[in-house]
Amino acid sequence: MDSAQSGDAQAPNVPAATEEPTGEATTKRRWRRNRIACDSCHSRRVRCDRAFPCSRCLRSDIRCEFTRERRKRGRIARSRLVETKTAVEKASQPVETRDSAPAPAEAGSGPVPNGSPSSTFHHRSPATNDVTGSAPSIDERRSQADVSLPPRKPGHTVNATEEWLAGTHVSPGSYEPLAGIGPGEGPFPRIFDIWNGVDLAGYSDPASQGSKITGLGQTPAPSATILKYPVLQPVMPYLESSLPRKLVYDLLDLYFTSAFSTHMHPVCHHIHCYVLRKASFLSREAPRPSSPALLASMLWVAALDDRAFALPISPPQRKKICQFLCALTLRLLRPLIHVSFKEQEGAAASDPLHAAVGQDGPPTTVHHPFEVGGDDRGLVGPAGSLDDVITYIHVASIISSSEQKAASMRWWHAAFTLARELKLNQEIEVMPSEENHPEGSSPSFDYSLAGWSGVDTGPFFDYSNPARPSLNCVCDRGHELRGAITEEHREERRRTWWLLYIMDRHLALCYNRPLALLDAESEDLLLPLDEGSWQSGNIHSNSPKPDGPQCPLSGEKNKRRVFPNFICHDHSIFGFFLPLMTITGELIDLNQARNHPMLGARLNGKDPWDAHVGEVLRQLELYKASLTTFAATASDPDAPLSSAFPPKPDQQPVEPSLAQAYSWHTQTVISYASYLVHVLHILLVGKWDPVSLIEDKDFWTSSPAFASTISHALDAADSVDHILRYDPDISFMPYFFGIQLLQGSFLLLLIVERLQKEAGEGILNACEVMIRATESCVVTLNTEYQRNFRQVMRSAVAQARGRPVNHSEIRHRRKAVLALYRWTRKGTGLAL
């Protein structure tokens, strides 16, 4: 029997909570358990002060109430059992045989056809404790079964929250205790141990056999009070009993916090760009319907960021919060693991996390039923949704920034595969048909949030050409239209695909692997909007191609960019970094062909090879010219600010502080872009592998190509000096910059290694700049390869400046460190 329930039926001989008159001034007060605790304290298993509203509910902004049935000790009387059985049998009768009329809420909802059941948010009736399914995301509306979870009694655990918080220095105005997350409690894995080469989704802590956390073992009901951000409603049943609402709100605010006041740029290091609109997520009237797994992963990403230390929580609390959100995210994603559902059901008894939820499972386990995407033998997993792809990106980004980089590829491959299954590389059809419907790419029945409905079969289908559904812009539609596929949803799909496109080229450069997402399958998709138009909601699908989406309202205005594009036009990752990654993809193809065991020997030095190299050089020159134009255009902050925000007739001149912030952002982008151009020049004609570069068995250092790369290496160091001026902590794009900094430093290391004391001061100063940048990267995103390379570079510079060392020993150690990261035919790059 749990402590809260035993408190309800407390014997009357418990000592009173009053002071005994002993005559001493320091008499210790004796407490007795309250016989009645409010619902919130009862569910969180903490002491209630019995003053309604109690102090805990007041601090947490939770409605304090007592609605559960009072229980007494002993066995239930037989007459009571008979009455309960009769009530259950009556409730299980068909609707047609009941004499009573349906409730107003039931009468308002019409009959639901098979394959298109309605879905609602979690809610719990105080009398019945019935929990309904959560609101699925935009793409999860197909064939969802209505689920009713039986109430579950949480396992008995020893609550050490009071003692734990007593040891932490938390101010009285900070967050309320994290109930049920005491030291050594709960089924949550240690966040730094689960990367240890194991499958994260299959992780199960042995300590979870005897204890279950309320947030995962059952789906407690959110309080009746209105949420500050209604978008969080699907995930609140999992968080209500473990995290205070104020903390959840602050983490969501941190996720959408911008590093600049002029443009939206993520401040969290694990967020590379915004594929979701801030205004749509934080809206109180029509929030974007999102899956619980996506919401949990967003909170996890925010909690992992260093800026979470600014929140009034202690480091031990933050660590436990990250552990909780990690376990919750992976648990909610578990149905998307590519295993048989039959095997998963058979393993329910042995899996404590699965057993805690039960065979019916939370609503997220039935978003993708087998009847739609599986086969008759249970060998094909569910399709998934756009929200699941974004969740995979969050999880994979977190693992990639850890030491277990190779383990992240399974998550990236899952994101790539699911994105291809959902056909994110294709323009979504406004009116999908049975034959041309992309599997899992669009919703097909009602949404549960106001203003976001299912698919409309309205007058947007081109009946004159039934073989090709209409792709035209639907910017005249609003969220208030029932069944509307909005332009926002179409743009989310594009931005998700292009983010994966960037990540694929980045990972291929890091891990010396071929490309997974090809240019050929991306050429029909419009490039992302600029960040200002996207965040302001000014979205149009207006392609310059005649066979692409057309916008009847815009006409020849608002023409979108198409692939391929080698122009720098925006401050966002999609604006200046996507063209460079397109060129990087061609360099990766060239390097893979050069390292091919048979193809490389036949093509190296031939005319087709030289023609390909010349084409890449042309693209780089085109980008450099656009970068100069961008710098000149961006010198006037009035133009971009008017595009980032809706113009006003009486718009005032830009404030000096805002103009300075815009100029600072522009110079940061130009510095990074200039450095990346020089690195791509080095990768085009130079060697990627540091050991082969130092050994120089083919005498490449005597070729004209080596002389041309030296100037780019020095110019790259000069660009890094500018980067350190505008972005001292390398926080603008730390995830992408590490490998670029490494490849740009290999040539300088080679020169210092060869020349030793004869190296000029310019070379040594360039090396010092690279070392300072590497040290900043280590502070921002601490990874082992950067720490190792910093030591190698520092020892080489110190040796060149005259420090006495054992040359043979130091060279052997230096080569041993560099041999860990190879870009040869069999090398795996940074993936150890």
From Swiss-Prot:
GO terms for molecular function: DNA binding; DNA-binding transcription factor activity, RNA polymerase II-specific; zinc ion binding. Residues 15-25, 100-119 have a biased composition (Low complexity). It comes from the Eukaryota. InterPro entries: Transcription_factor_dom_fun, XlnR/Xlr1, Zn2-C6_fun-type_DNA-bd_sf, Zn2Cys6_DnaBD. Pfam families: Fungal_trans (PF04082), Zn_clus (PF00172). It is found in: Nucleus. Keywords: DNA-binding, Metal-binding, Nucleus, Transcription, Transcription regulation, Zinc. GO terms for cellular component: nucleus. Residues 1-28, 84-157 are annotated as: Disordered. The keyword Zinc applies. GO terms for biological process: DNA-templated transcription; positive regulation of metabolic process. The keyword Ribosomal protein does not apply. PANTHER family: ARABINOLYTIC TRANSCRIPTIONAL ACTIVATOR ARAR-RELATED, XYLANOLYTIC TRANSCRIPTIONAL ACTIVATOR XLNR-RELATED. Transcriptional activator of the arabinanolytic system. Involved in the regulation of extracellular arabinanolytic genes and in the regulation of the intracellular activities of L-arabinose catabolic genes in the pentose catabolic pathway (PCP) in response to the presence of L-arabinose. This is Arabinanolytic transcriptional activator araR. The lineage of its organism: Eukaryota, Fungi, Dikarya, Ascomycota, Pezizomycotina. The gene is araR.
